[in-house]
Amino acid sequence: MKTILRNLFYTLKRFQTASVLNLMGLSAAFAAFVLLMMKVSYERDFDTCYPHADRLVMLNLARPQEENYVSTLPRGPIDYLIQQVPGIEYGTIYSPAWQKQAFYTDPKNPQYFYEEPWAVYPDFGKIIGLKFVEGSDQEMNRPESVIVSESYAHKLFPNGNALGSYLYTDTPEWRNPEATKFRICGIFEDLPENCQFKNDLFVPMGKLQENDWGSQNFFAFFLLKPGVSVEEVNQQIAATEANKRLFTGDQGTQKLYVLPIQKLYYDMYSPYYFKTGSRSTMTLLVSIGFLIILIACINLINFSTALAPVRMRSINTQKVLGSTNGELRRALVAESVSIVLIGWLLSLGIVAALIRLNVLSFMGFTPSLLVYWKYVLYTGVIALLTGIVAGLYPSWYMTSFPPALVLKGNYALSGKGKRLRTVLIGFQYIVSFALIVTAAFIFLQNRFMRNHELGIDKDQILVASLPQMPYHSSPYRKFDSQLKSFAEIDDIAYAKWELGATEGYTQYTFRYKGNNYGHQYIDVTTNFCRVMGMHILSGSDFLPSDSIYTSQLNFIATQDLQEESSIPAGETLDFFPWGMSATLKGYVNNVQFTSLKTGSVPYIFCPNGIYSNNVLPFAYIRVKAGSNMDSALQHIRQTMSECFTGYPTEVKFYDQIYGQLYQKETNQQKIITWFSLLAILISLVGVFGLIIFEAAHRRKEIGVRKVYGASTGQILWMFGRSYLTLSIVCSLLASPIAWYAISEWLKQFNEKIPISPWVFLITCAIISLITLITITIQNYRTARNNPINSLKSE
């Protein structure tokens, strides 16, 4: 054993570059694998942290052809079902803030910060199993109470006096308008990152929209009684009057039902607030992780096999001295295991360094060796198994020849040895090609979505996030006046939403001649369409007087609605959710304020909605064409700080806002791109290492060829030809696999790019070029050597 190890260290030292590269590739592969397994743990364990996760369900509203769509609900059926369904133990409304609200902790010196508190019922803590470190939720039946997370309490009150302290607000909370300050009555343990209720602030739900069966603004969660199944509760819901009493515009076609909380993440699509994932993505990540490990394992097998001719004499000497094949093979497998475990330990150091450098945000979660320690240990077990598997064939191979054969020739360069290496390297090329093509198409689809025509002049629009106060208040008037005095500002419009930042907005339904038409409803100022660069296709634009509150609302709709309904401009609509009528003043071109993953839904813009309370906290600032955007940004920021002193404000380019919709796809693209590049890099490391050995063992052949007149270029082509052919053949074999994977991924988008053959050809060319460059760099010196030296040494 000592002799074998001594010979191994001598060989590794002799081929130092190849040895270091192989170990680096192994370490990088396991670092990628550890990170991917952490991500898989995050995905796999989503919403499993609750004490009664198997009894926690969400109430949803099924619609025709939208069974997997998470719908907002009216409050009426939520309260009704909590009282009427015997299988429900506890129930809570789960109401989003819809807008950020400004709070402060010191009334004498207000320093404002924005938060989005969720409104819940007093039983919320029992339903999801909150653990309180201080106080409790017993006071959550009082309107001026609030519970906060432990980390948030430390952030707001570093001295530890959070319990009993107050959060103040100047703008009444819309779900609880009588509350202008909130007393912290409980501090709960932070919930894990991979759960739906990861929020820092929960307030009591007021009396807003009680007994309202039409306005859809809420979500709801129930805790079922022990032993009661989801199917039983759904039967109990169907037996009530809830579905008949719904007044959401699609009577008779909708159905209330509950679904397990864990189904929300994996099987539902939610445009609002809730996190969603997919099992196919998790499968893809697992596959990528194991493929990278397999590539590294193949490198190790090739590396060990290539070392065989150098080590064969020592191994056969051990046979002569009495060592059995079994003993030698166990020792060689132990070597392989040791190398892999060293690589695994180095990979943990790499992961720790990457976490410390904070460069893993694209992973979509917070990696941690401590939090995911179980999965880190699992990767260690896999490393052990990898070492055993990678060592089995080389150990058998190096001990399988009689001494006479060892003295006669070089099996490593025989036909059978070459075929083995060709198959192993070919597999690496197939995996690398498929991953790179997949990453390329994901990049192209993301670029297509980001550059898609939105129907507005996005390049001339800046969006400012302002405090929640009426837009005709004194600070807003000052802000508006000062900005318009700047020569580069064309005009300013205001809206309730940061359009383009979310997958959906307030949805309502109106009735016209007995038919119901759904739409996304946006509160705006009368100049909004002009500022955004929309074009009036029929009818007329808003007049300034259209913003006056009357019993008649004023609408402008997008062309989608006209194509769907054929309602002429100027008609009166029955806006029954509010018990009002509305005048459809005109139509504008279609606009895209959601991602291309969602279907097209008409938009309606209204300047005199009764529920906006004139609070339109997003300013859409149109900059004149050709203006200096940096100068405009500087002026806007300065004006915001002067007009809204103490309030946190923000201004963005519209592209920044719209890009948030594709953050998940962007992260996915980065994951696949980086790990695809790693896969091809590890493959090239393997090729590089084999070229070193092949060049070393073919020095005599090279010398003879040089003596007979072969040029340096011919020698390089002799090495590169087989690898070039292999890369092209493997690219052809991998193309159907990559095409299938991409076509399946693209199915989630309503508008998508074509699968162009040029991407496959360019990827093949890039891989072939990189391979040739690698071969040329490594073999150039060998090809240039004096043949006399090569023949003399041989």
Which residues does each PLM region occupy?
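Alpha-helical transmembrane segments
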Residues: L21, A28-R55, N358-M363, V431-D459, ...
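Hydrophobic alpha-helical transmembrane segments of multi-pass inner-membrane transport and secretion
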Residues: R14-Y42, G277-R313, V340-L341, L420-Q445, ...
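Membrane-proximal extracellular/periplasmic loop immediately following the first transmembrane helix
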Residues: L36-Q101, Q209-E210, S215-F222, N234-Q235, ...
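Mid-to-C-terminal secondary-structure elements
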Residues: W118-V133, V146-G277, S481-L661
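Membrane-helix entry/capping segments
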Residues: M1-L5, Y10, R14-A18, Y50, ...
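Small-residue-rich transmembrane alpha-helices
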Residues: A31, L35, Y257, S336-P403, ...
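Generic structural signal for small/hydrophobic residues in well-ordered secondary structure
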Residues: L12, N22, E43, L59, ...
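Intracellular coupling helices
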Residues: L5-L21, G25, A296-I339, S400-Y411, ...
